[in-house]
Regions:
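N-terminal strand-loop element at the rim of the active site
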Residues: 13-20, 32, 36-77, 163, ...
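A short, glycine/small-residue-rich beta-strand->loop->alpha-helix junction that serves as a flexible
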Residues: 13-28, 49-50, 97, 209-212, ...
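Acceptor-binding helix/loop patch of EC 2.4 sugar-transfer enzymes
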Residues: 14, 70-73, 115-147, 165, ...
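Nucleotide-sugar-dependent
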Residues: 20, 24, 212, 257-265, ...
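Conserved catalytic-core segment of nucleotide-activated headgroup transferases in glycan assembly
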Residues: 25-26, 32, 186-189, 201-244, ...
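Membrane-proximal helix-turn-helix segments that form the acceptor-binding/catalytic region
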Residues: 31, 83-90, 104-105, 116, ...
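Carbohydrate-associated surface elements
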Residues: 162, 184
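A charged, aromatic-enriched C-terminal amphipathic alpha-helix characteristic of glycosyltransferases
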Residues: 324-326, 337-369
Length: 375
């Protein structure tokens, strides 16, 4: 099928489908849309040639894929992606736009309604990750992207409830058609494993960019090793930019997304410690790795203030929120690892909030809410 065919929904993203986020978050959602009987398309920015296996998976589910080149990094690269996404945008009755760049590109090319799928405060995160605070012109352009996305969106989804008031403060005319849909996982692939391994094992999962606090992670791991006999593995995809974390890991593995469920099941718990000076950007964050650990039945250790995680983990007894007293935090962790009910509480939390099937249903309802009927 060509770009001239008008599909029910086209998913627009500047992320790569073949990398971790694409494989864990986007592809399952697309397949879920197709399972609803929708004619589905997707346009994405790829850093390497599209893998044949992924092409076949999408094709077998009746999903049209238009991969375009990711291009260069940096602000100029981002501008180029806006132009290319707009230029090659497939036709659709409605669009699902992942992030500011995708929403802006869609609004430039099409007048059809779209969901602005806010995956966090993008500009705020880029300032932290790329040091943009001194690049005034770049910041102004990025703010214009966010403003345009907010003004044109017919519906907005966020990973957390905590970030929506921030968006409303910045953009008073933002639609009130808002739904919280956290980072989700396929609960069938990330199946429940009730028994924690006898040997204590910490799995550091995924790419640890500058958003994560490796100094505090190192401090926590150092204290942990004094109290527990523990083996630490860092596991990531091919896209990782660093050779080592340097936080006390005993081994490193490079695995694909389909290999991750087994690796998590063989671990005792996960960890996600973000920098405390990340400002409002933390309010919009919901790390994929956290959802994956909870789905399999593994508790997580996280820093305070990450999206809605504080209340979720505390209410369900599914993890530890780091405090100023790391020794007490470690005691809480030991208690969780010794409690045979911990795995069940983690899975229950995942089923309540992080189910991909639930996300598909919510997104599908939003498409109906903005005036489309696929019957």
């Amino acid at each position: 099928m060509s770009m001239k065919v008008t599909r029910d929904v086209v998913y627009v993203t500047h992320d790569s489908l073949s990398e971790g986020i694409g494989m864990s978050q986007i592809v399952p959602l697309l397949i879920g849309y197709a399972g609803k009987g929708l004619k589905v398309g997707v346009i994405s920015c790829e850093k390497v040639d599209a893998p044949l296996e992924l092409r076949e998976t999408l094709s077998q589910n009746g999903i049209y894929w238009k991969p375009i080149k990711f291009g260069r990094y940096g602000p100029l690269g981002g501008f180029g992606r806006v132009i290319r996404l707009a230029l090659f945008l497939p036709k659709a009755k409605v669009f699902h736009c992942r992030g500011d760049i995708s929403a802006t590109a869609t609004s430039i090319r099409s007048k059809k309604p779209f969901i602005w799928d806010v995956r966090g405060l993008w500009l705020d995160q880029k300032i932290i990750l790329s040091g943009l605070e001194r690049r005034v012109i770049v910041i102004r352009i990025a703010k214009l992207l966010e403003k345009r996305a907010a003004s044109k969106a017919k519906a907005v989804t966020t990973l957390t409830s905590a970030v929506y008031p921030v968006l409303r403060r910045r953009h008073p005319t933002l639609t009130t058609n808002h739904t919280v849909i956290p980072t989700c996982v396929d609960l069938t692939k990330f199946s429940f494993s009730p028994k924690l391994p006898q040997k204590r094992k910490l799995l550091l999962s995924g790419v640890f960019n500058d958003y994560y606090d490796l100094d505090r992670t190192r401090e926590f791991v150092s204290l942990l090793k004094k109290d527990l006999s523990i083996f630490i593995t860092w596991c990531h995809g091919k896209e990782a930019l660093r050779d080592k974390l340097g936080v006390g890991e005993d081994e490193k593995k490079v695995l694909t997304q389909p290999e991750m469920p087994k690796e998590i099941a063989n671990s005792s718990f996960g960890l996600a410690i973000c920098k405390g000076d990340s400002g409002e950007s933390l309010l919009g964050v919901m790390p994929t790795k956290v959802a994956e650990f909870l789905a399999i039945g593994r508790p997580v250790v996280v820093s305070a203030g990450i999206g809605d995680l504080d209340s979720m983990l505390m209410e369900h007894g599914a993890g530890v929120i780091l405090s100023n007293n790391l020794e007490d935090d470690i005691k809480q962790l030991v208690n969780l690892l010794s409690d045979p009910q911990t795995a069940y509480r983690c899975r229950e939390l995942a089923e309540l909030y992080f189910s991909m099937d639930m996300a598909v249903n919510k997104y599908h309802q939003i498409l109906r809410d903005i005036g489309l009927d696929f019957n």
